[in-house]
Each structure stands twice: as C-alpha cells, then as structure tokens.
C-alpha cells in the first residue's frame, strides 16, 4: 500500500487515536451482533502489544448532532472489555476538558473509548475546529473504519490533516483485497449484483462491465432488466425510469464481450408477504397481478454453474426477498455456490453477508467486507475520502 500502515509507525508510549466502526446493533442496552467490534481487534491488540496508549472513537446510529441516551457507547465499552479481557475507560464526550484529561492520563497498554462522535453536528460537517480538537488528543491517527471511509467526516477525513495518518489492519485488508480484485483479478472474474434497485447499483455495474468476464444480475433489480428485454413483469418492482438505462447496460455488456446473466425463471407471489401464495414461472409467463420475489430454481442452477471454475468472485446484494423464508432459496443457492469457488471470493452488503452467515459458509469466503456503502463506492471506482486523506509513505 502507498499509504502509511500500522507497521510503519513507532508506537511505544505514543497516544494513538483510532477511528473504528463500532456502529453495532443494540437491544436493551446490549450489543446483539459484535462482528464489527471483533473486526477491529487485530488493530487494537497490535497497538496495545506495542506499548501504545489507545484512544478509540466511533459513531453509533443517527443521533443527528444531539445527545441521545440510547445511543451512548457504554454497551460497546462493556462488549469490548469482554473481548479484550482488559479494562476499557469510557468518557461521556469526545472533545472537551474531561476527555483531554482522560487522554493525558492514559498509560501504555490502556484503552479509552470516546463517546458517540455524531452527538456533535460538527462530525458529519467535517468541521476543521472539531477535527483539530480530536487530533489534539493524540500523537498519531489510525483509520480502521472501512465502513465509514466513503464519508468525509471530521473523524475519518478531517483529523488526518493534523496528525500522521495510517491505515489499520482492517482498512488495509479491505483496500488491498478489493483493489486487487478490480485492478489485477485472476480470471475468470465473475460479479454477482443483486438487491432491490438498479438505481443504487448503476455505477457499480458500469464500472464492473469494464473488468469482469461474467456479470450475474438478481434480486428486484433484475425485474427492470427483464422489462428492458420486453417481458411483462406483472406487479413486480420495476424502475420504469431506469428501463432505457438497463437496455444500454445490456448493449454495453455485449460490446465488451461480457456474459450478462439474467433470470430464466422466477418465484412469483400474489403479495409482498412471507406466507403469500407463490409459484415458479418462466420469465415470459409472469401472471398479471403477481410479483417476482426471488430467482427460480433453474436460474439458481445456471448461476451456480457460471461460478464453477471462477478464480475471482465479487458478490453484493441478495437474489430475492431473503428475509422471507419462501423467497430466500435463490440467495441461499448463490451463497453455497460462492463458498464452493476455489479462488478469491469477496462478499459485501448486509444481506449477502447475512446469507453466507446463515448458511454457515462464512468461513469459506475469502473476504467478507465490513463496509456496505464503502465497498459499493470502491466497486464504482470512486476514491474514498477516508483513504485519500491518509499519509503517503
């Protein structure tokens, strides 16, 4: 990597300000899924092992610049304590005299967790004064929050102007893994793009069409592509205004020699409900008043077949309404097929990650991306502000 990383830093006795992504789900004051906290442990433990005084900062939820008691980071501090097996000091703000005193009092090998950054409106505005206040707490800055790297906020971008700024292990792994897939993939390179809306993924598809050998489309967005091919989609979700664009992307794939796979059959239902009557139909036989909620079994087999022999796979977005059991089979079939690939596999996006975890195959995936929006913007070929701001080696 051309940017500073943890291994480049002199850490002994240094105060290190680390931006982590501890935006985790809470219920009744407890962390219900600690995946993101665990993902930051390698960086935190490396810093502690090298005698650093560690100051952690994160956002949680969307308090919109005001203090919301239910979004305080105390439950996160408790969860982190149990994972680290050592005390985590917690303060009730992220700037100000109390915080400055706590940071100054830290000893090597100790951890301080600051309060939710988004209690201050200046965080999301990337206010230079606020960024300078955060930076004043430490000697060095480390960004390990890939999930927030696409945001130019005070804690992800602003702080890097005032301190030597390095990538943590998680951020480094995300950038190197996704970067290699896009810049120098082993081939065949297959991308699977799903989710409800084409409009969310247009730039991703356009960028991937210049890189992949095969592009597989599923989920609600496939309906818009099928409509673009002239099929009647009943009352399926179709983005009418995106139909011409879908036609353009189908033509672009043909021009670039990219094999674009669309569903051949669909699971359709009478309404958007878990227990709605449903049936499998060919794409040219969607009944009036029915809606497509998953890819059909023939399509699932075709998609799995297209993954056989792939050397690089990127998957982002489910094949159907994964949260309803009746319409989860397509996503589950793709999850199994991706896990069976003997090459580099990268899975990103909440539903795709949930699918590989639910199927118990997460351990067989080469890289599970922790950043939804950030990994999408990376796949679009965009520069991420949180990465750009890091110090060059």
Swiss-Prot record:
Enzyme class, UniProt record, top EC level: transferase
Pfam family, one: PGK
Family: Belongs to the phosphoglycerate kinase family.
Keyword Ribonucleoprotein among record annotations: no
Catalytic activity: (2R)-3-phosphoglycerate + ATP = (2R)-3-phospho-glyceroyl phosphate + ADP
The gene coding this protein: pgk
Species this chain originates from: Moorella thermoacetica (strain ATCC 39073 / JCM 9320)
GO molecular function terms noted in the UniProt entry: ADP binding; ATP binding; phosphoglycerate kinase activity
PROSITE patterns given in the database record: PGLYCERATE_KINASE (PS00111)
Keywords, comma-separated and alphabetical: ATP-binding, Cytoplasm, Glycolysis, Kinase, Nucleotide-binding, Transferase
EC number(s) reported in the record: 2.7.2.3
Matching HAMAP family: Phosphoglyc_kinase
Subunit structure, as described in the record: Monomer.
Protein name: Phosphoglycerate kinase
Coarse class of the protein's main subcellular location: cytoplasm
Chain residues that bind substrate: 21-23, 36, 59-62, 118, 151
List of residues binding ATP: 201, 323, 349-352
Subcellular location(s) per record: Cytoplasm
Pathway(s) of this molecule: Carbohydrate degradation; glycolysis; pyruvate from D-glyceraldehyde 3-phosphate: step 2/5
UniProt cross-references to InterPro entries, sorted A to Z: Phosphoglycerate_kinase, Phosphoglycerate_kinase_CS, Phosphoglycerate_kinase_N, Phosphoglycerate_kinase_sf
Keyword Thylakoid in annotation: no
Gene Ontology biological process terms, A to Z: gluconeogenesis; glycolytic process
């Amino acid at each position: 990597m051309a940017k500073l990383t943890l291994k480049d830093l002199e850490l002994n006795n240094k105060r290190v300000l680390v931006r982590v992504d501890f935006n985790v789900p809470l219920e009744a004051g407890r962390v219900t899924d600690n995946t993101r906290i665990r993902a930051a442990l390698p960086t935190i433990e490396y810093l502690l092992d090298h005698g650093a005084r560690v100051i952690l900062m994160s956002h949680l939820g969307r308090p919109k610049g005001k203090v919301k008691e239910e979004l305080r980071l105390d439950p996160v501090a408790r969860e982190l304590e149990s994972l680290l097996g050592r005390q985590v000091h917690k303060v009730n703000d992220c700037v100000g005299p109390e915080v400055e005193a706590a940071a100054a009092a830290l000893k090597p090998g100790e951890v301080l967790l600051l309060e939710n950054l988004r209690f201050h409106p200046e965080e999301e505005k990337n206010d230079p004064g606020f960024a300078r206040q955060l930076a004043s707490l430490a000697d060095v800055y480390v960004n390990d929050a890939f999930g927030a790297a696409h945001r130019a906020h005070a804690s992800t971008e602003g702080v890097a102007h005032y301190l030597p700024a390095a990538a943590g292990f998680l951020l480094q792994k995300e950038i190197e893994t996704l970067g290699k897939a896009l810049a120098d993939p082993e081939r065949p390179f297959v991308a699977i793009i799903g989710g409800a809306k084409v409009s969310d993924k247009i730039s991703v598809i356009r960028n991937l069409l210049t890189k992949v050998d095969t592009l597989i489309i599923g989920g609600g967005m496939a309906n818009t592509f099928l409509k673009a091919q002239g099929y009647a989609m009943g009352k399926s979700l179709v983005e009418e205004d995106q139909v011409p664009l879908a036609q353009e992307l189908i033509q672009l794939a043909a021009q670039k020699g990219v094999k674009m796979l669309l569903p051949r059959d669909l699971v359709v239902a009478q309404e958007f409900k878990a227990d709605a009557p449903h049936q499998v139909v060919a794409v040219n036989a969607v009944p009036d008043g029915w809606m497509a909620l998953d890819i059909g079994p023939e399509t699932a087999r075709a998609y799995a077949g297209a993954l056989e022999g792939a050397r690089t796979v990127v998957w982002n977005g489910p094949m159907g309404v994964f949260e309803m059991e009746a319409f989860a089979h397509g996503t589950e079939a793709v999850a199994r097929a991706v896990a069976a690939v003997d090459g580099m596999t990268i899975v990103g996006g909440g539903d795709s990650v949930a699918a590989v975890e639910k199927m118990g195959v997460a351990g067989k995936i080469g890289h599970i991306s922790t950043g939804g929006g950030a990994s999408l913007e990376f796949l679009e070929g965009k520069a991420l502000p949180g990465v750009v701001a890091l110090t060059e080696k």
